[in-house]
Regions:
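Active-site metal-binding loops of divalent metal-dependent hydrolases
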Residues: 35-37
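Structural motif
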Residues: 30-32, 61
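PRPP-dependent phosphoribosyltransferase catalytic core
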Residues: 5, 49-183
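Short, glycine/charge-rich flexible loops or terminal/linker lids adjacent to PRPP-binding catalytic cores
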Residues: 1-29, 39-46
């Protein structure tokens, strides 16, 4: 969805865009990847490792609406130029020492953390405060990152989220297993 809007605003032809499986066949010396959020950097890092041969001799740019310093560092180590619109830091993590979320009501912070973490452990035991302890509190109209608090998005263990999270399909086989009757 974000790529569609980017293409429309930049008035770019669909010919300028390729599927990841076509990277090796492209003659371009420059590859630009566009993403909404890059918080832990793990997904982007795995993508580049999986396509390392295809990226050889190419200049790689990674555009992201939101990124963390951790994710920036991971990709810069791979010689990838990362261009984020905004970099989130400890101030954006709900329960960090530097968090801006409770600056007006600091006395509520510990009580809120106990409640959020308590429910989080029930609905997402391995990521009670979000993937990689994200502690973020944001989402988009089309999806919500798993780094955000799971009390907002998880539907595990009978929880009814206020926002539905749609998992990404990592490959065509995974999508076909779930939606094969449509294909």
């Amino acid at each position: 969805l974000i790529l569609y809007h980017f293409r429309q605003e930049a008035r770019l032809s669909t010919d300028c865009f390729i599927f990841p499986t076509s990277i090796a066949a492209t003659e371009s010396d420059i590859i630009v990847c566009i993403d909404d959020v890059m918080m832990s950097g793990g997904t982007a890092q795995r993508f580049f490792y999986q396509n390392q041969e295809d990226f050889a001799e190419k200049k790689i740019y990674y555009l992201a609406l939101l990124s963390s310093n951790e994710a920036l560092s991971k990709l810069q180590e791979l010689n990838i130029k990362v261009i984020p619109c905004a970099v989130l830091d400890e101030r954006n993590r709900v329960f960090s020492e530097e968090s801006l979320c409770f600056f007006k009501y600091p006395a509520l912070k510990e009580t809120a953390k106990i409640m959020v973490e308590g429910y989080g452990k029930i609905i997402e035991p391995k990521k009670a405060l979000g993937h990689m302890d994200g502690q973020y509190c944001f989402g988009f109209s089309y999806n919500i990152p798993n780094n955000s608090l799971p009390i907002f998005w998880s539907s595990s263990n009978g929880w009814n989220p206020i926002f539905c999270r749609k998992e990404k399909y990592q490959n065509a086989k995974q999508a076909k297993r779930e939606y094969g009757f449509f294909i």
